[in-house]
């Protein structure tokens, strides 16, 4: 039996990059997957690809910077399309600004990063938890970053948002475990995706400092998410799982 057979998963920011890889991997493991992001055409292509491989997937277009009503609509439509309460939520979507000195961050950038990276996961999780509780439990996986653990110059805004998400993981894990809901974080290091292939030489150079000297791939992160979403991780709550080639270990 596939590890996520019969379960419903919502993966935010899944029209590209790590989110797309996670959504596709979950479908291969038997989950009913709801893909969401900006761009209906791209979303439809991903759904078509999953279905062509024998999986089940749906798409909901949603703007996570648009506030609570939009996020609650996403939760409702995802649940309706899945035909059951969402069992697995992957809070993957994030807004990333280019590295810059902290003195040059604008209020607009600060608001947008915190809106998408912290507020949206908070509201979406709150909207889906009641259904998980009613259905006997679930799994929430927050996509963190090693940038939310280590201090990295010129990325303080993004790092602060991810550190906030890491904190939510621990608090929610303590609060929701009694309801059968597990909350954990996956924290990728630099990862090559289809959208940053042009940065491969830089990412490979960074990987030379890792103990395993391996550049992260989407598949590396997706494997960690699948594990935490599965029953194999049934006794794991509130952890931060780095997928970074050992970078945080040194």
Predicted stretch roles:
Residues 8, 15-17, 39:
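Conserved glycine-rich cofactor-binding loop
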Residues 122, 214-243, 248-249:
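C-terminal substrate-recognition "lid" of short-chain dehydrogenase/reductases
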Residues 130, 174-178, 234:
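Alpha-helical segment proximal to the catalytic Tyr-Lys
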